[in-house]
Amino acid sequence: MKIIEGNLSLKGDEKIAIINARFNHIITDRLVEGAKDAFLRHGGKEENLSLILVPGAFEIPFALKQACESKKFDGICCVGAVIRGSTPHFDYVAAETTKGIASVGLGANVPVSFGVLTTDTLEQAIERAGSKAGNKGFEAMLTVVEMLNLIQKIKA
């Protein structure tokens, strides 16, 4: 059986976008730094990395759709942070952001990763943005890198 699997190495000419929700920027700035770090560590060049800023997580799917349609990017890494509050707002934003990214991602012709934190507390978000639980922005970028490689191997 032939196994087709991506790896974590970039050629250096891949153009990648990070879409970042500014809301909860104390968390999302760390996710962006993690994503950028992963991109550079695995062979990407900073001049090939674009940062698209949106107001909040709910706006990520629309920006993602526009970025995919532009055909300027080989892959797109989505990051944000939705932290539960005392109202049901969290449930709506988290669910619709997730559905929107998944929907656009399935229709895209480029890899799209989901690095949007959905946590119950600020402490949980901090843990996932570079402290105890690693950096989910870094992990989301690794997903883009691996999927780029996988697509190239599938098409070869």
UniProtKB/Swiss-Prot annotation:
GO biological process, one term: riboflavin biosynthetic process
This protein's pathway: Cofactor biosynthesis; riboflavin biosynthesis; riboflavin from 2-hydroxy-3-oxobutyl phosphate and 5-amino-6-(D-ribitylamino)uracil: step 1/2
Disulphide bond pairs: none
Membrane spanning stretches: none
PANTHER family per UniProt: 6,7-DIMETHYL-8-RIBITYLLUMAZINE SYNTHASE, 6,7-DIMETHYL-8-RIBITYLLUMAZINE SYNTHASE DMRL SYNTHASE LUMAZINE SYNTHASE
Keywords annotated in UniProt: Riboflavin biosynthesis, Transferase
SUPFAM superfamilies per the UniProt record, alphabetical: Lumazine synthase
Function of the molecule: Catalyzes the formation of 6,7-dimethyl-8-ribityllumazine by condensation of 5-amino-6-(D-ribitylamino)uracil with 3,4-dihydroxy-2-butanone 4-phosphate. This is the penultimate step in the biosynthesis of riboflavin.
Entry keyword Transferase: yes
Name by which UniProt lists this protein: 6,7-dimethyl-8-ribityllumazine synthase
Reactions accelerated catalytically: (2S)-2-hydroxy-3-oxobutyl phosphate + 5-amino-6-(D-ribitylamino)uracil = 6,7-dimethyl-8-(1-D-ribityl)lumazine + phosphate + 2 H2O + H(+)
Positions with a binding annotation for (2S)-2-hydroxy-3-oxobutyl phosphate: S86, T87, R128
List of catalytic residues: H89 (proton donor)
EC number: 2.5.1.78
Top enzyme class: transferase
GO cellular component, one term: cytosol
Gene (name only): ribH
